[in-house]
């Protein structure tokens, strides 16, 4: 076996050691979370070796097969696809999870079930690794369902809270809708191609792939919270902050985008699928950016920004640039995890206060967290030479120079501008101005578990984009021929967003509105989506069932058994009685006439 898969699989199997140790039940102590964190850091360091060797060797793909089972028509094997996507993604995911695990030791220290929480986080990571390295649809489906069930368990971690239970159920139900598309695609590939192996599917390259690609797009819509199946993502903020950080950076939500990236050889020749993907991504990125503008919960602002960035990744796949979408997944993981961890630090220090209107002035009291939050927000907006710039700027450039839908491009540019606006708003309310929280709150951000984890991601948010984009192929970019205004478009719309946000803030600083405007209602009520989809159908269903039940009871049983049955019996009997008048003379006369006529007719004549 080649050294690449050997080392990579060693780092992946290292992750299973804490799970195996917990089942053996050798010893239970309070240091288990520390051991798990150390094991993930060890796995990250091991995974760097095969990744660097892979990058510099130039080998495209290495697959390791272990025969699993054979049915009458299908051969299933455990097959790991260690190609460009998985080899780059695994170290990024391990690095981010290592930081989140260390942050969790500080954030969840008072939780009595912290060891169980860490096992769930580790299982979450393992299932994502299965999904990323899978070479057949069955294995990919195991990872796909794994991240779904682990997200359910982690979002509903504080099961004593009704909102957490509702959010966990919402996440699993929306993902079920997406899973229908995935299973439909699996069934199509099995019935038409008799294979779930990715190489065989791409080699055969069927002509009519609209149906399976629509199924895969539906699956990605559910998992990556695209427009229509997006409401579960902001609701998922009911879970602990480390869960939000892991869910939004390198696991669950990027799984849908990763699925479409995996199937890009089929998508690149299908105009229908690409147009739908482009339009879906454009609608999502704009809609969620508008929703983020007026939110007051700090975690929900960051959650909507995640959904907006996922929409941008889907747009990138729609313009047939899967490698760029993948680059954005990798760079986005660093600063998004850091933003959530900074918000967790603020929430924890302010006694679980999440409303940005009740914060303010934190730049002086929490300088390290504030600095990290500002750098993370700048990286999110695509500020030059931070991590986000290396992928986001390229995406906007490529969209500008592509032969693509102008409407989708315009929506993407507006969403990019709004990203700067809501990031500025979050910084303005949270860190600047006078403190608006109670004076007796003790603020302490000096715990090494907190500072070390954020420091690592801070370094990643500044330098990771540079290192990743310079080490992945093509290492030499061909000369671009585009006008300067197209080259600077991403920067122009971002600066415009910053300027617009500050200008509107200053212009409306002393204004008071008695009634909220319609755009404000649309944004703060999330486009009326939860109201329409979560309130109307249940209320209509309840009303219809209540009416039908009452009608059935009243009309069919209560009325028919007593009042209607008595009246019906009386009418029938009265009709029967009134038909017999008792006129005996008339009866005898009619009998006599009938008898006489019959005798006359039947008597033979001589």
From Swiss-Prot:
Entry GO MF terms: NADH dehydrogenase (ubiquinone) activity
Presence of the UniProt keyword Translocase in the record: yes
Pfam families, per database record: NADH5_C, Proton_antipo_M, Proton_antipo_N
Keywords: Electron transport, Membrane, Mitochondrion, Mitochondrion inner membrane, NAD, Respiratory chain, Translocase, Transmembrane, Transmembrane helix, Transport, Ubiquinone
Superkingdom, natural source: Eukaryota
Membrane-spanning parts: 1-21, 38-58, 87-107, 114-134, 140-160, 171-191, 213-233, 241-261, 273-293, 301-320, 325-347, 366-386, 409-429, 457-477, 488-508, 582-602
Membrane topology: Multi-pass membrane protein
EC number: 7.1.1.2
Role according to the record: Core subunit of the mitochondrial membrane respiratory chain NADH dehydrogenase (Complex I) which catalyzes electron transfer from NADH through the respiratory chain, using ubiquinone as an electron acceptor. Essential for the catalytic activity and assembly of complex I.
Quaternary data: Core subunit of respiratory chain NADH dehydrogenase (Complex I) which is composed of 45 different subunits.
Similarity annotation: Belongs to the complex I subunit 5 family.
Name of the protein this chain belongs to: NADH-ubiquinone oxidoreductase chain 5
Gene it is expressed from: MT-ND5
């Amino acid at each position: 076996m080649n050294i690449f898969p050997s080392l990579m699989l060693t780092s992946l199997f290292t992750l299973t050691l804490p799970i195996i140790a917990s089942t053996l039940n050798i010893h239970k102590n309070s240091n288990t979370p520390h051991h798990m964190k150390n094991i993930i850091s060890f796995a990250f360091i091991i995974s760097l070796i095969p990744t660097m060797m892979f990058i510099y060797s130039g080998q495209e793909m290495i697959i390791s097969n272990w025969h699993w089972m054979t049915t009458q028509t299908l051969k299933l094997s455990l097959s790991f696809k260690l190609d460009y996507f998985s080899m780059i993604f695994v170290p990024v995911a391990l690095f981010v999870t290592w930081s989140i695990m260390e942050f969790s030791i500080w954030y969840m220290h008072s939780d009595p079930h912290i060891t169980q929480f860490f096992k769930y986080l580790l299982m979450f990571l393992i299932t994502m690794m299965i999904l990323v390295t899978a070479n057949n649809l069955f294995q990919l489906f195991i990872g796909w369902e794994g991240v779904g069930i682990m997200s359910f368990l982690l979002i509903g971690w504080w099961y004593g809270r009704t909102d957490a239970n509702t959010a966990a159920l919402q996440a699993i139900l929306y993902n079920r809708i997406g899973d229908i598309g995935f299973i439909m695609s699996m069934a199509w590939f099995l019935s038409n191609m008799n294979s779930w192996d990715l190489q065989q599917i791409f080699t055969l390259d069927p002509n009519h792939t609209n149906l399976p690609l629509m199924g895969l797009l539906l699956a990605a819509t559910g998992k990556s919270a695209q427009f229509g199946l997006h409401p579960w993502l902001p609701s998922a903020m009911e879970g602990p902050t480390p869960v939000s950080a892991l869910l939004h950076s390198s696991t669950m939500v990027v799984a849908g985008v990763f699925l479409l990236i995996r199937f890009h050889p089929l998508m690149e020749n299908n105009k229908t699928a690409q147009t739908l993907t482009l339009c879906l991504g454009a609608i999502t990125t704009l809609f969620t950016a508008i929703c983020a503008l007026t939110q007051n919960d700090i975690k929900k602002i960051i959650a909507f920004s995640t959904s907006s960035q996922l929409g941008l990744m889907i747009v990138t796949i729609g313009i047939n640039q899967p490698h760029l979408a993948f680059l954005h997944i990798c760079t986005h993981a660093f600063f998004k995890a850091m933003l959530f961890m900074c918000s967790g630090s603020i929430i924890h220090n302010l006694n679980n206060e999440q409303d940005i209107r009740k914060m303010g002035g934190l730049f002086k009291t929490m300088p390290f967290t504030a600095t990290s939050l500002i750098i993370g927000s700048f990286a999110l907006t695509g500020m030059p030479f931070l991590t986000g710039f290396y992928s986001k700027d390229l995406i906007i450039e490529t969209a500008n120079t592509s032969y693509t839908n102008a409407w989708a491009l315009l929506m993407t540019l507006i969403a990019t501008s709004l990203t700067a606006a809501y990031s500025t708003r979050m910084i303005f309310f949270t860190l600047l101005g006078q403190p608006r929280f109670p004076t007796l709150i003790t603020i302490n951000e000096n715990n090494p578990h907190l500072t070390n984890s954020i420091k690592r991601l801070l370094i990643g948010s500044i330098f990771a984009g540079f290192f990743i984009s310079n080490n992945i192929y093509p290492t030499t970019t061909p000369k671009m021929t585009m006008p300067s205004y197209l080259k600077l478009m991403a920067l122009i719309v971002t600066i415009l967003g910053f300027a617009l946000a500050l200008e509107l803030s200053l212009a409306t600083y002393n204004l008071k509105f008695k009634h909220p405007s319609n755009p404000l209602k649309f944004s703060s009520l999330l486009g009326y989506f939860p109201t329409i989809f979560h309130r109307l159908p249940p209320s209509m269903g309840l009303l219809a069932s209540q009416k039908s039940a009452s009608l059935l009871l009243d009309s069919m049983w209560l009325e028919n058994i007593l009042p209607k049955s008595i009246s019906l019996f009386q009418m029938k009997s009265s009709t029967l009685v009134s038909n017999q008048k008792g006129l005996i003379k008339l009866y005898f006369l009619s009998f006599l006439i009938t008898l006489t006529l019959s005798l006359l007719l039947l008597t033979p004549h001589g």
